[in-house]
Amino acid sequence: QFVVSPGLDEAIVQAAQTAGLAVYPGAVTAIGSDGAGRVTAVGSGVTGLHPGDRLALPAFGCLRSHVTLPAPMVCRIPDSLGIEQAAGLPVAYITAWYGLMELAHVKAGQTVLIHAASGGVGLAAMSICRRAGARIFATAGNDRKRALIREQGAELVMDSRSAGFAEEVMKATQGRGADVVLNSLTGELQELSLNLVRDGGTFIELGKSGVRPLGNLDNSLGTMRYFPVDLVVLGDTEPELMAGIFSRVIRDCAEGRLDLLPVRSFDIDDYNTAFRFMLATRHTVKIVLRWPG
């Protein structure tokens, strides 16, 4: 593949691992949302990066042999962290940290409901909440996934495909509701989740469907704060904030303050097997494609 020269403040990274293979309805980007590799070239305005450096990167559409992106949006991988492990961290941890810590300001003792908690963002969110000392309520779609999140320290584990979680949350909080809901459900289950947020609490919307216009929420939801999260928008509007979060979570994962995410690697030539594995929806690992060399 032909690789162009980097712009003034850009870096070109030769991919070693690519993660984030899911395609969402309405998505306009190509496949691949994060990964890791080595620098092959940097622009004349870039300092602190050199050819050969190992980098992790959140870059939508990065399922390609080389990725060109702004230098501030990459993060050097510490020596203690494997490149395969690093590839699965960027989007999951940036999303979870931004929602929980920058928007919701999760604190010790607060109750956080995490939907679909066995996925990458969910597992990252659980690790962040454990570190913060929050109570974790979590949902997942089958028994195996629920067993996993129970092992990860969830106090209350429920079925993400059944409306019964709403009653369980209200019972466990004596009718008060959760301080924070990290949502990825849709339809009726999304509506139920909106009504589980206590007055003054925070609803973080990760889904791409059913997102409500800010300032247009039903008055019945009281004083709840509502934030949709979109990393493409965050990278465009607040690149320094996103880069700061990225650097912090990579460092914390390398130093053991946050948990690494489980990964399963496939050779790039075996991409069909990787996609079939992903579409089976039974996995609880981050799927990574491994490039040659």
Located regions from the model:
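N-terminal glycine-rich beta->alpha transition that marks the start or flank
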Residues: 1-35, 62
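A glycine-/small-residue-rich N-terminal strand-loop-strand element
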Residues: 24, 31-60, 78-80, 133
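Short helix-loop-beta connector
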Residues: 50, 79-83, 105-111, 175-176
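Mid-domain Rossmann-like dinucleotide-binding core that forms the NAD(H)/NADP(H) cofactor-binding site
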Residues: 90-163
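Glycine-rich cofactor phosphate-binding loops and adjacent beta1-alpha1 units
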Residues: 104-106, 120, 128, 155-223
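C-terminal capping/lid region of NAD(P)-dependent oxidoreductase domains
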Residues: 112, 175-180, 191, 250-264, ...
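Glycine-rich phosphate-binding loop and adjacent beta-alpha segment
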Residues: 132-150, 188-252, 291-292
